[in-house]
């Protein structure tokens, strides 16, 4: 399993703690240095939808006024933007074989 995470994110720390407690092996990837690939983002978008992939509480989301742009943004434009800036991506993202989970929900992680 790959876990795209940010070390200053409380939700990410909860996900890491949960996985460690369950003895799940995972590769930790700093989402700010290595954002998810376009392929992963497209797959996540099919599960969650475009708007749910954005970290709406992030500073850069507000600075870039993404909320205003989402109305006219295509899925490809969103994927390009998210793949270029990991701080815009909702986290953590867990990628395991055929499943992608965005955010941390204990029920989804079980």
Residues of each region from the PLM?
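Thiol/selenol-based redox catalytic cores and closely related redox-interacting motifs
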Residues: 31-110
């Amino acid at each position: 399993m790959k876990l795209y995470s940010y070390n200053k994110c409380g939700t990410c720390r909860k996900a890491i703690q949960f996985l460690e407690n369950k003895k799940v092996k995972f590769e930790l990837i700093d989402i700010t240095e290595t954002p998810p690939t376009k392929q992963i983002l497209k797959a996540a978008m099919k599960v969650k939808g475009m708007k749910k992939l954005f970290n709406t509480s992030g500073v850069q989301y507000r600075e870039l006024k993404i909320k205003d742009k989402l109305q006219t943004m295509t899925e490809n434009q969103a994927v390009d933007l998210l793949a270029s800036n990991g701080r815009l991506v909702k986290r953590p993202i867990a990628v395991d074989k055929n499943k992608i989970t965005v955010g941390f929900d204990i029920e989804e992680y079980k």
